[in-house]
């Protein structure tokens, strides 16, 4: 695919006090982020959850970390275990954690953890 902005440097686009878009911020980390997605989805594949009303969600999703968002006939929950495997969600990949921290610092939140 042709990237018309391949030569553009990352930049920040302030939206409002305390909110900014970090354009192209994650591009240099793309390979590590995709590896992290592969690691998560190997253990907890993408799936279409069903709402309490019985409708299948159009978005396929998975989770990682201590809690994951899930839905079932009883409602919406944050769950420690994957409802399909009853195993804990995969740990959040280090590349995700590093990106979150570095983006928060770049956006003006130096104490983010």
Predicted regions and their residues:
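Non-heme Fe(II) oxygenase metal-center motifs and adjacent flexible, charged/small-residue loops
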Residues: 1-113
